[in-house]
Structures are given as structure tokens and as C-alpha cells.
């Protein structure tokens, strides 16, 4: 099955908003064993939308179209669809009823602009939108099935999950020549994408049913595995075999699979160890704490954090001795170690993490230029450990990789530590 996605709207092609619908659709279809072959962004230009619809329908079995279904003058995607199909727009009584119900629930009546959303191409199938006013519209164009969805991500996702994906799945199941697929997304940190590619290359001949793919989601790199076979059992077996080999190759650089998030994995590793954590952050400005507290239940193991940006607060809040700051500066191995030890003592936790550095664009010294970061871990029974890293890129990138490296020091320590009885 060939699937294409057409996203409409001037706001997409001018950079005013970022298209997130396509990445969501690609990921969800990948779970079904379907690869999106093409994604097209087109502005609010009628001839361009009409031509794009015709071209996509000539190539694909399924075309998912987002945007341009609302009540305003620049919402004319369905008008373009009707023209592409050579049929008129018709006012649908059921959609009219849905609109009146939705507006009445808010004590309103739909105005003439809102009623435009009831006009759909002749012969199409409107489907009620559980999250908004504009319906999903399903129609045929040539040999392709077209799904028209609102561009609002919340509405797009609801209709995709509730209607579009089940229909695509049913079509796949009904095909006698169906290729069965199985998937795994291996999430890594601390290994460059180029090294992943080199490590995976020899596996291809040994696993002919596997399609390897790569995705960078800084600071992570992901390895995508897709098995294709004549039956589901064969696809599952092929995936299991290659996954074993990949896990052996990646070792502890592999932190999770599929939808497992890094911060959640770190917190779960802490929880299994019966340990607690506190952090002292300077250049990252609370980014580590933000990542951890975004995970529900993090308070079970994450006790607290301090953003100690100035030298004064490094001493006042986490007990960095003033003479350490005077001799070694705020960005140094000695200061990072004192921060980690100080926040651990102050919070009474098993572990203390710290990070201090030059995120840029200003600052830095000849010995420690912009991008230099010191990350430290204070742990029971062992000397405090500090690692110096050098990150290239802008301020946000330095902060992102500094936070990642600091947490990874803790994760690797926990993996190497003896299991709690």
C-alpha cells in the first residue's frame, strides 16, 4: 500500500507554524507496517492544491490531506477536492445537524461562515469530529481513497486514531497479497548516527527480511528495524533475531525501545535501585529538573534541584566553598564536584548531579572555550566523578547535550552498580 500525505496552509509553507501532523502520521502508519512515501506541503493556492490532489491520487492508494476544512475564507480544501473530482459541493444535512448540536452545547448558533463546513463533495462520506466542528471527509479520486482531516493537531490525531487508521488496517487485512511487518525502534544515546550506520551495515546480508533505518532526535539516535515477511509469525521471528544482535552490539548505549522516553527510563532505573536524586544546575538552568519532573511519579525518586547560576548561590545553596570558586572559577572540575556533593548533602539523597559550563555565545577561556561543560556525579562509597565535555553548536544545543550527558553519567553508574538485595 502506497500512502502519501498532503498538508495545506500558508502558515506551513511560510514557517509560521511547524507541521507536526506528518510526523505523527508517519509514526502511526509505521506501526501498521506502512511507510509514508511522500509528504507534500502546499500553500493556500487553489490551482496548486487541485494539482497536488490529482498527482497524489495518481500515485497512491491512500492520500491523507490535512488543513483547510474550517469556516474561514482561506479554508477551501474541499472545494479543490470537488473540482479535482469533477463533482459539485453539496450541503450535507447530517453535518448541519452536528454543527447545530455543537454550537447549541455552547449556547450559540452557527453563523453563515460556520455553516460552510457542512458543504462536502458530492458522493463523499462525512464523519463526525469528536474534538471539533469540521468533519472528516472520505472520498475516492481515481483509484485512491482520500481522507480529509482538520489541520488542528488535536482534531487530526483524534480522527486519525478513531477513523483513518482502523480503515487502513482493515484494507491491509483484506489484501490477499499482504506483506506482514513487525517493528522495533531502538533508542540510543551517546553513539553518533554515523557509528550506528557502520555497525549495522554488516547485518544486512544476515537479515535479508529487515529494513534498517535511522533517525536523529538530538541528543538521541534511533535505530529503526522493520521486518517484512509473507506471514506475521515469520516477520516476528525475523525481528526477534535481528533485535538480539542489535542489543548485543549497542550494549548499554541502548536505553529504551519504541515509545520509552529517556527521562522515564532514568527515573525507573533509580526506582529499581531504591535510590533518590538531587541536582544542582548552572548552565542548563533547570533543564535536567524539567525533564525529570515532566514524568508522572518522578517525586518518588527525584527529591529536588537548585539552579545556582551565580557564584553567590553556588556557595549559599549548595555549599561550594568560596575559596574553590576563587581558585578554580565557577566553570571547573572542582566546582562541579563541590556542587554535586553539596546538593546531595543538602537534600539527603543517594545521588547528586551537577553541571556547570559555558553555553555561549559569550564567556569561555582559552583553556575552557564556549561549549565546555563539567558534569559531576556524587555517589555513596565512591569518589565524586567529574567529566569534561565539549559541545559544538548554539546555546540551546550546548544546554541540551550537557543535560543529557549528566543524566547519562548517572544511568551508566546505576547499570554498573551491584543490584540491591
UniProtKB/Swiss-Prot annotation:
This is CinA-like protein. SUPFAM superfamilies: CinA-like, Molybdenum cofactor biosynthesis proteins. PANTHER family: NICOTINAMIDE-NUCLEOTIDE AMIDOHYDROLASE PNCC, NMN AMIDOHYDROLASE-LIKE PROTEIN YFAY. The lineage of its organism: Bacteria, Pseudomonadati, Myxococcota, Myxococcia, Myxococcales. It comes from the Bacteria. Pfam families: CinA, CinA_KH, MoCF_biosynth. Belongs to the CinA family. It comes from Myxococcus xanthus (strain DK1622). InterPro entries: CinA, CinA-like_C, CinA_C, CinA_KH, Competence-induced_CinA, MoaB/Mog-like_dom_sf, MoaB/Mog_dom.
